[in-house]
Amino acid sequence: DTMTIIAPTEAEKLQTDEWLKYFRYRAIEYFTDPANERKHTGRGNRGVNDVAKQLATIMQILLVKRLESSFTAFTQSLLNLRRYTENMIKMWENDTIFVCPQIDVNKELDYEAKTLKRGKRVSFNDCVEDIRAKITKLTEQGRNEKGQNAEYNRKDFKEEYYIQLKEDFRLISNLYDRWAKNPQDPKFDAFKENIKPELFNPQKNTSGKLVIFSEAINTVQSLARAVKAKGYKALVITAANRDEMEHTIEENFDANYEGVWKDDYNVIITTEVLAEGVNLHRANVILNYDTPWNSTRLMQRIGRVNRIGSKEPFVYVYNFMPSAEGDAQIQLVRKAHTKLQSFHVLFGEDSKIFSEEESVVHYDIAKAVDGEESPLQKYVYEL
């Protein structure tokens, strides 16, 4: 019943109220003063209800994508969402509520991390002062547009908001407790079983190197552990270490590198940070462990190994497809098919990239692809 809780269908919503409403991201819906609402209207004078609903929907989609990525990533995302919801509850109970689109309030309220970093105990009140200082700085710099970054009190919100937050927190906590006890992940098991016989099949993987993409850092870390357990040398790249590891990437995976080639690593496992702007074409096998949010990224990922200068005759692309339940919510398969079909039509591509259905798909391309990117997408990696 996990999907029913995190992303119910309209029919399921009629049968039960036990599903997440993502109220942590809907505070602006509950302002009592219309003047505060006007600070947060969207483009085209969209009301706060529409803005909040869109943000909540993005967080819902992200949670579904984390579930599709790996059970480890999903469980960690539940833990994060529980903490973020608890932060809002704590602000309410302390009568100090921050709504700050330009400030990472959840990061600022992580007093345990701040205590470790500063080497002295940091309290909730210390964190509050940090946020106030950031708001003041934004205002002084003329960057606090319409006063969107502001501090409020309980009286500025409808009382029902607190009740809804508590209900969300209960559902998230119960779901997390269940998933924290679940060691099974069939997708991950299938990956481990196919590392050597399929991904390193010498008849296909003639380069002896492999590129793996995933959007979730927790998934990347799990994949790295599995690859290393099979005896392969894995290089893990995220935004945190991309720059410092650039030379290592070139030495081990760039077929155009003019220096001495190295084989310190035969697998590179990365997030979207390497989806563009880098050569990885000493490898000729790529695995998309999860399908990217923007289907154009799929082509960009594959373009890392399918490049001029490759020494291998063929490139092999493997994809883990989303489940039917998950894709009913995020529609990644449909968007990927549509975008890739448009490439085939426009550029005469004759290689099937995502599935056998590509050459016969005839969706309304403009309708399916339009709106993939959201102005609120900056929030989606929060989980």
Predicted regions and their residues:
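A short beta-strand element within the Helicase C-terminal
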Residues: 278-290, 300, 315-319
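C-terminal accessory region of SF2 helicases/translocases
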Residues: 310-383
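Conserved helicase core region in the C-terminal RecA-like lobe
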Residues: 217-218, 267-274, 293
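Helicase motor interdomain insertion/brace
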Residues: 1-240, 328-332, 338
